[in-house]
């Protein structure tokens, strides 16, 4: 490891921190299982919603998930390779023509439905 310098050193450190995650893209509906520490106990919370965007690469890659709860839109951004993500599960695959789905924010819940990939 001491022989590596510069960009090679950065890439080798990044490779050790990458997690094995399933393939998903904007338009897919995913479940994100998040580890939460509450004082002396630990639990897993599930956040299910539509992937609006995915950006970055390697260790710094993030994705944003949107869901509607009690009539209010909630968006959370997660690092893909975070240790707090227990797992990411793809519920269904959607067909979209954009990489960033910010237009979904302005649509009603019925109009914001995404076609499902067969």
UniProtKB/Swiss-Prot annotation:
It comes from the Bacteria. InterPro entries: Ribosomal_bL19, Ribosomal_bL19_sf, Translation_prot_SH3-like_sf. The keyword Ribonucleoprotein applies. Disulfide bonds: none annotated. GO terms for molecular function: structural constituent of ribosome. GO terms for cellular component: cytosolic large ribosomal subunit. Coiled coil: none annotated. Keywords: Ribonucleoprotein, Ribosomal protein. One of its GO terms (biological process) is translation. Belongs to the bacterial ribosomal protein bL19 family. This protein is located at the 30S-50S ribosomal subunit interface and may play a role in the structure and function of the aminoacyl-tRNA binding site. NCBIfam families: rplS_bact. This is Large ribosomal subunit protein bL19. It comes from Onion yellows phytoplasma (strain OY-M). The lineage of its organism: Bacteria, Bacillati, Mycoplasmatota, Mollicutes, Acholeplasmatales. The gene is rplS.
């Amino acid at each position: 490891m001491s022989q590596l310098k510069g960009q090679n050193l950065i890439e080798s450190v990044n490779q050790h921190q990458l997690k094995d995650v399933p393939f998903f893209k904007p338009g897919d509906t995913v479940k994100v299982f998040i580890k939460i520490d509450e004082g002396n106990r630990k639990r897993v919370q599930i956040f299910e919603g539509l992937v609006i965007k995915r950006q970055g690469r390697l260790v710094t890659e993030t994705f944003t998930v949107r869901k509607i709860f009690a009539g209010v839109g909630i968006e959370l951004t997660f690092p893909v390779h975070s240790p707090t993500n227990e797992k990411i599960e793809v519920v269904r695959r959607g067909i979209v023509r954009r990489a960033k789905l910010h237009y979904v924010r302005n649509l009603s819940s019925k109009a914001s439905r995404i076609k499902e990939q067969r």
